[in-house]
Amino acid sequence: MGGYELVDGRPDSGSLETFRILPPRGRARLLAPASGNELIGSYSTFANGRGFRGAAITSGLWAAVRLGQSDRVLDRRVSLVAHDGVEGSPLRELLESVLHTPDFSIAIRLTSGRPNAKLVVAAISPEGEPFCFAKLAGGPHVAELVRHESRTLADLAAIEHSMVIPEVLFAGDWQGVETLITTALPMRRLPRSAVTAHRASDDLCRLSGMQAAELAASGYWDRMKGRLATLQSSDGPEVGLIESSIEFVEDRWGASEFEFGRGHGDWSRANLGLAGKQLVAIDWERSQADVPRNLDLAHFALIDDGRSAGSRLLDVTLLERHTAELLALAGRSSDRAQALTALAVLEMVVRFAEAVSAGLEANDAKFGPLLRALTLRPVDSVPPSQG
């Protein structure tokens, strides 16, 4: 891509960039600059759980670098090598053109097993801080997500709101690859309660105006059924489960009136943080202007509980209770907790199915089984919160 390729080790000639591979064993997830603050900063930038574990690994990297042990601890390397006729690094030249400085190192996050897999590149300052992020789509499915995020950020930049969102530095085709480059936003991780985020999610719903409609008659539900039709036509995975789940939702809540407004689409700790008292929100590629109000809160509960559960199957009742608690923190009624939970889980199953249908390596070991458990279980009242 872009006139060069990745090769193992450090070749004798033609190397444009050299990276250390993190983690040092197992599947590569991050290509980090080879040394110093940039190496440490690249891990901190992409750790996505800026909690205890992320801090511990960052401390370990810092110690290895300062003690001169990085070559021994991080012994896997890969290099970017230019194709014949290519001079310099086209990717570096692109980043230099938007940053107006050559003083940075490149870090690359490798994503697989996810429904939005793409290369994410960071330009890291000599002090180890990110200057910007570049998303490079690897195919038509992801290219549309990248284009959609570019449009969403432009729309949000044109209206008044209280969130801090990335500024677009470049958006469009670059050497045949749909690309989005945005500013990197400094943010500290959300506290455990994350009340600021929960309240902001309800404010976000109103940004594009709100409308009320029966679920089955809404544009949102038409789009969901259209996605199912596309999967059916391409013999996509989990079609039977998605069909039965859509019937399940329509039978129980299709005639119920919902409010619809702007949703982020991936409202989770990995994409949210704080800058002072303001909420920072990144990664808007799944945002839509007509989703059920507070669907983001159900997604937040789903991702939070999923990380806590590890490889264990999530408990449907506990997940619904968590959604109800987040609704209460946002000042909203918990009446829709069950419906929103079902819609959040269905959305994730559809995303993974769409990715697999598009030829991506997307492994859903969690949401499909959860959706089956949810649709086979009687619909009762949401259990009361335990505090």
Regions inferred by a protein language model and the residue ranges of each:
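Active-site acidic catalytic loop and adjacent metal/ATP-binding pocket
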Residues: 118-123, 251-295
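Conserved kinase catalytic-core helix
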Residues: 149-165, 185-231, 242-257, 265-268
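Conserved short submotifs of the Hanks-type protein kinase catalytic core
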Residues: 176-187
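Juxta-kinase regulatory segment immediately upstream of eukaryotic protein kinase catalytic domains
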Residues: 2-3, 7-8, 15-110
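ATP/Mg2+ or Mg2+-diphosphate-binding catalytic cores
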Residues: 312-321, 351-387
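Short beta-strand micro-motifs within the conserved protein kinase catalytic domain, predominantly
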Residues: 167-177
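Active-site activation/catalytic loop segments of kinase-like enzymes and analogous catalytic loops
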Residues: 295-331, 345-358
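ATP-binding glycine-rich loop module of kinase domains
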Residues: 117-147
